[in-house]
Amino acid sequence: AAHFHVDMSDESINTAMQKWNAFVNVIQTIGELRKKRYPPITGTEFHQLVMASLASPKDLILPYSLDFQKELEGRQGIQNCRARLMVVGGHLHDPEFIRMIESQGALVVADRFCTGTIPGFHPIEPIGGNPYKTMAEYTFARTLCPRMMEEFDRRLNTIVDTVKEYRVDGVVLEIIKFCDLWGVDSMPLVTALRERGIPVLKLEREYRLCAEGQLRTRVQAFIESMGK
């Protein structure tokens, strides 16, 4: 810490966690708007906000997030979407993937990525005054990655509950190529969701967005298969 001139004192870490919590409160408030019958925000916009938050210090991005929140309060809701979708899968850094899905008339109203908003964006609750223990508990207890094999039911229930809460019509399961963890997890996940009457589209993607025409065709066919 001294070599990089970084303050790693308990006070400094606690301050950083407070800044995180302030930002998370804004993200959660904006995310709640996606539950509306006519959300004022697209999935692409929300994903852009999330990606910016992962690359920027929270005290720098917070003012812009608050301004965006105020802007959304004055917006009219999106009424012309064909289907409300939830995107599930590994870490997704490219908002263009969401934009591609929404270009077919869908609206992405929820996500469940390994490091996405549902498992990752929660306030940090202090544990016994030890900030290091608090951060460790937050990191390992919140992240719902398939590498935690015993957590399958928890991941499944999180998705099912979100489908109900956000009035989702169908789930898009995106798997980055060669990610064995999601590759293995996807088979029982697709089966379990379909058994519960939830339509699922499984898409395998490259790290970079490519074969857009094929992806658009599959998304369009998925929406039509739901009668939308």
Annotate each language-model stretch with its function.
Residues G89-I159:
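Redox- and metal-dependent alpha/beta enzyme cores, enriched for Fe-S-associated oxidoreductases
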Residues V163-L173:
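Proline-aspartate-enriched helix->loop->beta-strand connector
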Residues C179-D185:
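Glycine/threonine-rich flexible loop motifs
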